[in-house]
Amino acid sequence: MTAPIIITADMGKADQAWANGLRRAHFPAERNRVDAHITLFHHLPPSHLPEIKSRLAALVQNYPAPAADLSDVMLLGKAVAFRVDSPELLSLRDELADALRGLLIPQDQATPKLHITIQNKVEPPVAKALHAHLLESFRPRPLAISGLSAHYYRDGPWELIGRWSFRG
């Protein structure tokens, strides 16, 4: 069977570099197999790749880059992430979800809580310590969203299928 497809929102170059740096510093090295990312869909069927690519291309051609903000530092048990607030990005995701309705697994049928994970699969006290440390200097700020990407999930590293940039 071919690998499932993951859809992510791409960050602008400076934000991507910043998030990747934090992820390299705090994610267990043996588990850090992908760059920092904002997941929109976790598991789309590869048999529908032509339709998925076509819909992603249409979305980015029809809309400017959505506004987004880093709004909080989240403690998720054994993980730490930055909350991403973007009603515009969620609206685009909803449009895509409606178009792909019959293809979505239960996890992808629900509206996601957008975030960027920078630490995962650590003991809760380690996550708590990083969360407290990041909260000390955290200030909400804008986050650049530049496009959408599709990847094959390969039991660890992802394989890039393609990137589509928002107009303007």
Segments and roles (model prediction):
Residues 1, 74-76:
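Short, ordered beta-strand-loop transition motifs
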Residues 1-67, 86-144, 157-168:
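Basic, often amphipathic N-terminal segments
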Residues 41-42, 77, 152:
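Residues that line or immediately flank small-molecule/substrate-binding pockets and catalytic motifs
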Residues 76-78, 157:
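Short acidic/glycine-enriched loop/turn segments that link adjacent beta-strands
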Residues 80-85:
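Charge-rich, low-complexity N-terminal segments
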Residues 145-155:
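Short beta-strand segments and strand-loop junctions that repeat across beta-rich extracellular domains
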